[in-house]
Amino acid sequence: MSSLQAMKTLSLVLLVALLSMERAQGLRCYRCLAVLEGASCSVVSCPFLDGVCVSQKVSVFGSKVRGENKLSLLSCQKDVGFPLLKLTSAVVDSQISCCKGDLCNAVVLAASSPWALCVQLLLSLGSVFLWALL
């Protein structure tokens, strides 16, 4: 085997190894809590072997107050309630979507409301409930 063939073989093996390492790191998801318009999210590797990326859109009082959580979970939990909000008679709509592709939870929900601080609190509570389901 000539040194040129050996170099080509070594390069091919190295390329395959590098491509495999990227996939071995697992699913990558956006992660942020209480996202409002213009906020950015960090990219994290999902710690779960067969996890999912999650995007939770929350609107309070109809569409006046809106925001979003993004994270990774072990499995898709579509039925997340807000038990503390039942005491306040707030109308809360939560939509959860799950996906399994890298950075697939990228869609950001726009927000335009003076109730932004209220949404941040509600979204933080919603994300705590999501994590508690694990």
Swiss-Prot record:
SUPFAM superfamilies: Snake toxin-like (SSF57302). Disulfide bonds join 29-53, 32-41, 76-98, 99-104. Residues 1-26 form the signal peptide. Residues 106-134 form a propeptide. GO terms for cellular component: plasma membrane; side of membrane; synapse. It comes from the Eukaryota. Keywords: Cell membrane, Disulfide bond, Glycoprotein, GPI-anchor, Lipoprotein, Membrane, Signal. A lipid is attached at residue 105 (GPI-anchor amidated asparagine). It comes from Homo sapiens (Human). This is Lymphocyte antigen 6S. PANTHER family: LYMPHOCYTE ANTIGEN 6H, LYMPHOCYTE ANTIGEN 6S. InterPro entries: CD59_antigen_CS, LY6_UPA_recep-like, LY6H/LY6L_nAChR_modulators, Snake_toxin-like_sf. It is found in: Cell membrane. Residues 28-76 form the UPAR/Ly6 domain. GO terms for molecular function: acetylcholine receptor binding; acetylcholine receptor inhibitor activity. GO terms for biological process: acetylcholine receptor signaling pathway. It is a lipid-anchor; GPI-anchor.
